[in-house]
Regions:
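N-terminal Rossmann-like NAD(P)+-binding subdomain of aldehyde/semialdehyde dehydrogenases
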Residues: 2-109, 137, 279
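ALDH superfamily catalytic-core signature
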Residues: 6-7, 13-14, 132, 210-347
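Conserved C-terminal structural/oligomerization subdomain of aldehyde/semialdehyde dehydrogenase
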Residues: 35, 330-466
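Glycine/threonine-rich beta-strand-loop-alpha-helix active-site module
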Residues: 91, 160, 538-652
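Rossmann-like NAD(P) dinucleotide-binding subdomain of oxidoreductase/dehydrogenase enzymes
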Residues: 99-240
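ATP/NTP phosphate-donor binding region
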Residues: 467-554, 825
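Carboxylate- and glycine-rich phosphate/diphosphate-binding segment that chelates Mg2+/Mn2+
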Residues: 620-730
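Gly/Pro-rich interdomain helix-loop hinge
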Residues: 745-748, 752-837, 877-878, 882
């Protein structure tokens, strides 16, 4: 007789790999067939498969009970029912095929695709219900599944999978939609998890198995162990809490991972609760029996030197309380369903505070709420991180406090944790037999696993234009002597006027006070007249302190851009004293999505802006430019909360403005309008304003400077505000970015700086770039065409975009010269060497400026450095390098 051949480990491994490869290859074929199923077919398959499993739920429960010798037949039947009924009902209307969602407003379309072949790992604790659950969610998502069952539950698990498979195939699923390893082994399970054809691993089991799943280099939905505390606080419904915990802990002899492992009871209700607990056939072990129980369950006794290495005796899992007591060496009354052991603390010294997966529960007394929460937290952190924790209380706030304190994904309130954890019976958690523990438990999933976890959701994003806006002061008054509105403005009693010394000396401040004195009510006012050109943050802070002391209900900003800008930031600091200046100056791409959200203003005061120069447009804009002179920085601050409440545009206030100032501010108006017109955020609403402002400047600036007649001064004053309205909503570009930084470094006049730079910027933006700016509405580069539009409007040569760009740049330069501006920085008294030394730094700072993102061409630092260097000599001598 021949000797029986001995199979070597290598041969065993190769055989397992061959078997697994065959299963996976068939699953891959099934995957392609399942992709062809529509939603109606999928739902029909799931319905038929679930009904077949439901029909056999008792038979399967008995098979599992007889094969494993663990748990309670009736409870296993309930778990099978749960998998067939609650899980399927929850995902009944879930779309898992093709287009599952379409939103015309956001432009998003979601398309569901299967993840691929699923490796299903099942435990001995819930063999049939887990097989049913994983098969059904795989069928729902068109994923073939290949199981590796726990060896001790191979037959019953395969029985469950076969029933689901056969019903699914009969309903139209492909032949190999559900498969399993027929000869279980570690080698086969490892081969399945590591097979390149397997897309994801759905693992339920011990920590070692879950860790192995996560080590396979592919997506894994593995879940961790639980060590669930139930804290019974003194306000709890004692009868309900005792009932729930006994029902939960005894269910299937404690084999559900969400079952309570310890009950923590406030001292005030301890005796009453224990008595209620005992009435449900819970046996409290004495000191001697506790030691025997510890020795049998964990091989150590409390406070012994080997406690740290205690390991659960797997034989007790799912066994009856009477059997465990007998094996431990003591007897308990017939019908005992839970063994309770009073413990002094949570942790290694009390082995019974570990997870036990059996009808054995630790009982601890809490001295206070804080102590109860602490003990519950310690339980969760004692090898149960992320899983579940329960609390029984009538105090809603305590429930929230408990939820914040424990590192558990599921916090179950006033419910049995077994059913609370698996969901849908006592609460609105997703029904599942695979419970994720999140990062606390080193899991990739932090929720109850369901069909959604087995889908690849593809997103189709249709291009959409961002919603745009027109935000301006609620009221804008214009025409001569419109300052009389101050007589009629409502709710004006305490007025702070922010201005500068020039307004005092020219008598404009007196004219404002005169209007306030004509009101029917007596007005108290505070004057802050210390605003300097390019106001410094220290000036703003001084004004804010005065404002806080005075407590105005109205702020009037009187003057040019400097008083209005300073007053805006004082307004912000006054109403929102906690705001940090550094937060205000941060750059943004989209003002609505900025990292720092400006607070809303206007709750304490209204803001009335009265311009006395025709340049900044600050009376209608959300912008303020504040300097940090200690660091040679100038910061443009932008937010619509800074938009004035009321603007009064009275041309009578600009009649005495010196011609040189009118020239500088007028060219600033032209720059505002030009940059707003070509901005990537320009719209139909801002374009008309920008073009009208440009037209008014070319028609009236020269006369305004040289003749100072009322008509031209009025038109330029209107142009300033109209341009402000345009750039308040379309924003600016790199002419202002560079002007801010040059002005901060060399203290040049802002409008004049823009005048010198603007021809260069027109040529730069008017050249088709290699890198364009980012804004959805700006769907193609068109700055050159828009400059051509301006040139045509002005009657300049513009037969092509290129000609229009050159004509307009030249016209801007010549207008600057005609109004007396020396159109280069050399003439501004700046040293050439110093200018070149700072050119690179200024270009970097300009790139970071808030005005740069709206420029129609993505501004490159090298290019801005060239513009800065060329502009020293002026457009006529060095017109710039077209790039």
């Amino acid at each position: 007789m021949a000797d029986k051949k001995t199979v070597t480990p290598e041969e065993k491994k190769l055989a397992a790999e061959k078997h697994v490869d065959g299963l996976v290859q068939k699953a891959l074929v099934a995957l392609e067939e399942m992709r062809k199923l529509d939603q109606e077919q999928v739902d029909y398959i799931v319905a038929k498969a679930s009904v077949a499993a439901l029909d056999a739920h008792g038979e399967l429960a008995l098979h599992a009970f007889e094969e494993t010798g663990r748990g309670v037949f009736e409870d296993k039947a309930t778990k099978n029912l749960f998998a067939c009924e609650h899980v399927v009902n929850n995902m009944r209307h879930t779309k898992t095929v093709g287009v599952i969602e379409e939103d015309d407003v956001t432009g998003l379309t979601l398309i569901a695709e299967p993840v691929g072949v699923v490796c299903g790992i099942t435990p001995t604790t819930n063999p049939t219900s887990t097989a049913i659950f994983k098969s059904l969610i795989s069928l729902k998502t068109r994923n073939p599944i290949v199981f590796a069952f726990h060896p001790s539950a191979q037959e019953s698990s395969a029985h469950a999978a076969q029933i689901v498979r056969d019903a699914a195939i009969k309903a139209g699923a492909p032949e190999n939609c559900v498969q399993w390893i027929t000869e279980p082994s570690m080698e086969a399970t490892s081969a399945l998890m590591n097979h390149e054809g397997v897309a994801t691993i759905l693992a339920t089991g011990g920590n070692a198995m879950v860790k192995a799943a996560y080590s396979c280099g592919k997506p894994a939905l593995g879940v961790g162990a639980g060590n669930v505390p139930a804290y019974v606080e003194k306000s709890a419904n004692i009868r309900q809490a005792a009932h729930d915990i006994v029902m939960s802990k005894s269910f299937d002899n404690g084999m559900v991972c969400a079952s309570e492992q310890a009950v923590i009871i406030d001292k005030e209700i301890y005796d009453e609760f224990v008595a209620e607990f005992k009435s449900y056939h819970t046996y409290f072990v004495n000191k001697k029996e506790k030691a025997l129980l510890e020795e049998f369950c964990f091989g150590v006794k409390a406070n012994s030197k080997n406690c740290a290495g205690a390991k659960l005796n797997a034989d007790i899992v799912g066994k009856p309380a009477t059997w465990i007591a007998e094996q431990a060496g003591f007897t308990v009354p017939e019908g005992t369903n839970i063994l309770a052991a009073e413990c002094k603390e949570v942790g290694e010294n009390e082995p019974l505070t570990r997870e036990k997966l059996s009808p054995v529960i630790a009982v601890l007394k809490s001295e206070s709420r804080e102590d109860g929460i602490t003990k519950a937290r310690q339980m969760v952190e004692f090898n149960g991180l992320g899983h579940s924790a329960a609390i029984h209380t009538a105090d809603e706030e305590l429930t929230k406090e408990f939820g914040k304190a424990v590192k558990a994904i599921r916090v179950i309130c006033n419910s049995p944790s077994t059913f609370g954890g698996i969901g849908d019976v006592y609460n609105a958690f997703l029904p599942s037999l695979t419970l994720g523990c999140g990062s606390y438990g080193r899991n990739s999933v932090g929720d109850n696993v369901s069909a959604i976890n087995l889908l690849n959701i593809k997103k189709v994003g249709r291009r959409r234009n961002n919603m745009q806006w027109m935000k301006l002061p609620s009221k804008t008054y214009f025409e001569r002597d419109s300052i009389q509105y101050l007589q009629k403005c409502r709710d004006v009693e305490r007025v702070m006027i922010v201005t500068d010394h020039a307004m005092v000396e020219l008598g404009f401040l007196d004219r404002i006070i005169e209007q306030l004195d004509l009101r029917r009510n007596k007005v108290v006012y505070q004057i802050f007249a210390d605003v300097e050109p390019d106001p410094d943050i220290t000036t703003v802070n001084r004004g804010t302190e005065i404002m806080r002391a005075f407590k105005p209900d109205t702020i009037i900003a009187l003057g040019g851009g400097s008083p209005m800008d300073a007053a805006k930031v004082m307004w912000l600091f006054y109403e929102q004293p906690e705001v940090d200046f550094r937060d205000l100056v941060q750059k943004f791409m989209d003002i609505r999505k900025r990292a720092f959200k400006f607070p809303l203003l206007g709750k304490k005061t209204k803001f009335i802006a009265i311009p006395t120069t025709s340049g900044t447009g600050s009376e209608v804009t959300p912008f303020a430019v504040i300097s940090d002179k200690a660091n040679n920085r100038k910061y443009p601050i932008a937010d619509y909360s800074l938009t004035p409440t009321v603007a009064i545009v009275d041309p009578a206030l600009v009649l005495t403005v010196p011609g040189v100032v009118a020239a500088d501010t007028g060219m600033d108006v032209l720059t505002h309008a030009t940059e707003a017109y070509v901005s990537q955020m320009a719209s139909d609403y801002t374009d008309g304003l920008a073009l009208q402002a440009i037209k008014l400047v070319f028609e009236n600036l020269e006369s305004s400077v040289k003749n100072a007649d009322f008509h031209s001064r009025e038109k330029m004053h209107n142009a300033s505000t109209i341009a402000g309205m345009a750039f308040a909503n379309a924003f600016l570009g790199i002419s202002h970015s560079m002007a801010h930084k040059i002005g901060a470094q060399f203290h040049t006049i802002h409008g004049r700086t823009n005048a010198i730079l603007l021809p260069y910027v027109i040529r730069y933006n008017g050249t088709r770039p290699a890198k364009t700016a980012t804004w959805p509405k700006y769907n193609y580069y068109r700055a050159d065409e828009k400059y051509q539009d301006i040139a045509r409007m002005l009657g300049l040569p513009a037969s092509t975009p290129e000609e229009g760009v050159e004509s307009y740049a030249k016209a801007v330069y010549e207008l600057g010269e005609r109004v007396g501006i020396q159109m280069n920085f050399k003439a501004q008294g700046i040293d050439e060497k110093e200018w070149k030394e700072h050119s690179r730094e200024l270009a970097f700072l300009a790139y970071e400026d808030q005005c740069s993102p709206a420029n129609p061409r993505l501004p490159m630092v090298d290019h801005m450095q060239e513009i800065i260097e060329d502009s020293y000599y002026g457009y006529k001598e060095r017109p710039g390098r077209r790039k």
